[in-house]
Amino acid sequence: MGGDKEKHVDGLISNARHLLGDADYRSVFQTGLDYCLSDIRSDLHGFGVDHDTFFSERSLSTDGLVTRAIETLEKNGHLYEQDGAKWFRATSFGDDKDRVVIRDNGVSTYFASDLGYLLSKFERGFDRALYIFGADHHGYIVRLKAAAQGLGLDPSKIEIQLVQFAILY
């Protein structure tokens, strides 16, 4: 599949939504989501990991957490606009570059969702946030701790473990 794969997938989704109608599309989407989550739970159970709660990333937007996190950064003076996008001044907190939170098209980034989740975690009364990342996401450590500082949270309350799979012959 040549070209921009994300645009291709977005086009397929748009066509499916148009052909099915909004209600049927949401039903098919939810069925697929439930199936995938069941598969993930089964895989994790095989590793001896059973969660009490799964958190929906979608709720970060629907509950206004992403918006609140961005507003908090703005209120704290840690956002600026450049080329139509909103940027978090992550370099003020030791990151190697500033990070986009709202693209020039008005859509929030995945990092903006991380901000909302981080805010939510501490608002729900947790005294620490534990993240487990693949080793290829090591750059996220400084970024996430910078985000905590920008939100007025204690970065020492964030613990990040890196894991890497290996094949042993």
Which positions does each model-derived feature cover?
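NTP-dependent nucleotidyl-transfer catalytic core
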Residues: 1-169
